[in-house]
Amino acid sequence: IKSYKWHFIPIIFGLIVAIIGIYFGIYSIGGGIRTTNQVLSNPQEIFGYKEFFGRYLSMIFTFITASAGGLVAPSIALGAVAGSIYSSFFENIPPLIFAIVGMVAFLSPILNVPITSAIVIVESTNIDYSNFVILSVISLISFFLNIFLKKIYSKIRVKLFKPTTN
């Protein structure tokens, strides 16, 4: 690309991600390993909507600029934070379970291999293999829900952008 204006796009989005990190906190930026480890090591500490929204925005802006940021680790972290938030509604169930379920549910549509997503989370979190079946079911549900929603959104897009004839 010979135009210099294209060099400013990553700089602008990089500054936006930096502002997101300042406003939403340290757990909203980065690869996601720190966030995931924090959720798994201290599940009683409930993350808020602020961290979730900040991580979601920083993941989008990093992906738009085609910067090295990935989708796998940030989506696992996003699922862990979502599970942490969701666990605040259920006091009788351990928060760690919700974090792991969120990790599987967010990873499956990204990788497009549901059973492998469940295996990756079971192996990386070192939980008991007796949970593998339920995590596989959750992974399959999120995978097929993603396929279903893609079909709906593509139909909506066709209807919205269909050329009108006069």
Task: Give the location of each predicted region.
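Alpha-helical transmembrane segments and immediately membrane-proximal extracytoplasmic
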Residues: 1-166
